[in-house]
A protein has these predicted regions:
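General beta-strand structural signal in soluble alpha/beta enzymes
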Residues: 2, 29-32, 83, 109
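Fold-independent oxyanion-binding glycine-rich loops
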Residues: 3-4, 33, 55, 111-113, ...
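Short glycine-rich anion-binding loops that position phosphate/pyrophosphate groups of nucleotides
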Residues: 3-7, 87-89
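Generic anion/oxyanion-binding catalytic loop in active/binding sites
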Residues: 5, 28, 79
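Short, small-residue-enriched loops and turns at beta-alpha junctions
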Residues: 6-8, 58-60, 117
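Short glycine-/acidic-enriched loop or helix-start segments at secondary-structure transitions
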Residues: 9-11, 39, 93-94, 119
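Class I SAM-dependent methyltransferase SAM-binding "motif I" and its flanking Rossmann-like core
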Residues: 11-73
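A contiguous loop/helix-start segment that scaffolds small-molecule binding in enzyme catalytic cores
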Residues: 76-146
Length: 146
């Protein structure tokens, strides 16, 4: 059992499940909230086609390249793109999104899902500029769509 989130999804619990599967042990997933699914549900974005990418590169050039690639997939495939960041790097992630994505691209920031102080808002990149919330110590999921 993992301590937070959805065990084995963007979580080291996947390694334990893989070992259990190799040993032919019965694996029983328990119903519970998944911030990935909940963020798609609350974003207003495409819930029929979406991709979760986990953590994006930390190095600025690589991160910018990845953000542009994800944004291209939004427009080419009509696919919602989701990713996460370590809470202390949330502000930098938002800045990088605002710097590298088109003004009309939509960004949903979903933070503290199912917890006190839950924050889920969707705006265009243009509309987020100058309105970045304080999320430095809060688990967040970032979603891009058109």
């Amino acid at each position: 059992i993992s301590e937070a989130g959805c065990p084995a999804v963007a979580d080291p619990g996947a390694d334990v499940v893989a070992i259990a599967q190799r040993q032919k042990l019965k694996v029983i997933p328990l119903v519970g909230p998944s911030s990935i699914i909940l963020s798609v549900m609350a974003s207003g974005f495409n819930g029929q086609s979406f991709a979760f990418h986990g953590y994006l590169p930390i190095e600025p050039g690589e991160r910018a390249k990845k953000l542009k690639t994800l944004e291209q997939r939004v427009y080419a495939e009509s696919q919602t793109q989701l990713f996460i960041e370590t809470p202390y790097r949330n502000h930098k992630m938002i800045e990088d999104i605002l710097q590298n994505c088109r003004p009309q691209t939509k960004l949903c920031i979903a933070a503290n899902i199912t917890c006190e102080g839950e924050f889920i808002q969707t705006r265009t990149v243009k509309d987020w500029k100058g309105h970045i919330p304080e999320l430095s110590k809060i688990p967040c999921i970032f979603l891009l769509y058109k």
